[in-house]
Amino acid sequence: MKILHLGFSDTNGGAAQAMMRIHNSLLDLNIDSNVLVAEKLTKDRNVYSSNNNFFEKYISDFKIKLARQKKYFFSSSNGYSHSLNIFKSNILKKIDEINPDIINLHWINNEFISIKQISKIKRPMIWTMMDMWPICGGEHYTDSSRYIDGYKDFNRDPGEKGFDLNKWLWDQKVKYFKNNPKTIVCISDWLQNKTKKSFLF
């Protein structure tokens, strides 16, 4: 069985380190575990980079910078990160090249793969949820109940201004996630309880 973990980085951040611990544990069990990232900093031969040349790296960096321009049409009192995942990437092509039996999603933000592209993965999928982004609009954490009740005009956080970006992103997830079967694994009981309440999962 060949497993492919998808995440933005193999080193930076707690989510990346957790992904690599899982990967290395599987290798210790003689399971064919592989990792695909945008930011490869280790020399692990089982870790592949989606940015293998100057052009791919430039496009990846440009998409991240472009996504940050949301500040010009959306603002929120929620101090946690908001991620878009709306720009197409080369990840589906890279997945086909590696040809795994199972996909394990981890922290896939920074425009690593788009919401729509996730729905086009045609292999059994596990999603190891590191935060609330998969069940929300663009938020990585929220106190709002919109992820349970749906993102409506009347229940928008009064601390948000401008275009309702979270509603638009949530609508994209409803469209593309609902018919894309996957097994959900949460890193904590708290997150698991949140996910069980989610409209999306």
Task: Specify the residue positions occupied by each region the protein language model found.
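N-terminal subdomain of nucleotide-sugar transferases
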Residues: 1-51, 98, 121-123
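Short hydrophobic segments within beta-strands
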Residues: 6, 36, 128, 185-187
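Short beta->alpha connector loops
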Residues: 9-11, 107-111, 190
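Short aromatic-enriched loop/helix-cap "lid" or pocket-rim segments at secondary-structure transitions
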Residues: 17-18, 44-50, 117, 137-142, ...
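A conserved catalytic-core segment of Leloir-type glycosyltransferases
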Residues: 28-29, 34-99
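Short N-terminal targeting/anchoring amphipathic segment
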Residues: 92-112, 123-130
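Membrane-proximal helix-turn-helix segments that form the acceptor-binding/catalytic region
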Residues: 93, 120, 133, 145-184, ...
